[in-house]
Amino acid sequence: LSLFILFFCTNEITLVMKKIVIFASGSGTNAENIIKYFETKEIGTVVAIFTNNPIAKVIERAKKFHLPIEIFSKAELFESKVLQKLNDFQPDLVVLAGFLLKLPESIIESYPNRIINIHPALLPKYGGKGMYGMNVHKAVVENKEKETGITIHFVNENYDEGNIIFQKKVTVLVTDTPEVVAEKIHELEQKYFPSVIEDLLTSN
């Protein structure tokens, strides 16, 4: 009599959450939106906030979620200190959400195609040094543009010139003020930025 015994092995699959580090300089509304979005997701989580502004409102927002906060000066950004701190968190993706300084090449080269930025216009229009926030919206209105939008792109060594990942347009009415345009852009940022980040984490 031959006895055959079959062993069934169940392999447990452990899902490793991908790590997001956010760089921000201002109020942090986009940062908070991203943090909240990934609280309900299994693909990734925000592990730290980096800022160059010691009085930025993003600091208070980060404290609500008990996240580590790294505050640094412009000079420190171009030293090895910030890169070393960033490496400590081992991020899968670095997200610039209203970060107003240009990243040094040392950071960009350490995280190729893993640093993204959101810009409040349809690049390549209204990009480059000094083109951020209300500066962009004023230029859009002054030039009587019929549409504007957001651009999410990879970061390279030049301002706003990295490969484009995603764009979304919105109509600009002749009666729109820069403040109205800013509100329209903010709505797009809140709606699309987190999901684009999720798509990037899923595809990599």
Residue ranges and their predicted role:
Residues 1-9:
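Hydrophobic alpha-helical signal peptides and transmembrane signal-/tail-anchor segments
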